């Protein structure tokens, strides 16, 4: 049985980029299953949909956040 859902255009276009040759149902099943496993799996899905430039920028941002966290001084 199929159901109709309404989503925002921007969400639709992100799902289209992520799904590749899969059906929307397959993609959503995968995302729901990954949610149960953790955020790292979700990031791995995202990396598969990013261009090389987007991956580089994402890694750069992660490094900046890590450096920022490492700069914190412990409070006694």
Swiss-Prot record:
Pfam families associated with the record: VAPB_antitox (PF02697)
Q: Per the record's keyword annotation, is Heme included, yes or no?
A: no
**Which key words are in the record?**
Toxin-antitoxin system
Q: Which domain of life is it from?
A: Archaea
Family, per the entry?
A: Belongs to the UPF0330 family.
Per the entry, what this protein does is: Possibly the antitoxin component of a type II toxin-antitoxin (TA) system. Its cognate toxin is VapC2 (Potential).
User: NCBIfam families given for it?
Assistant: PRK13696.1-2 (NF010250)
- Provide the protein name: Putative antitoxin VapB2
The record lists the organism as Pyrococcus abyssi (strain GE5 / Orsay)
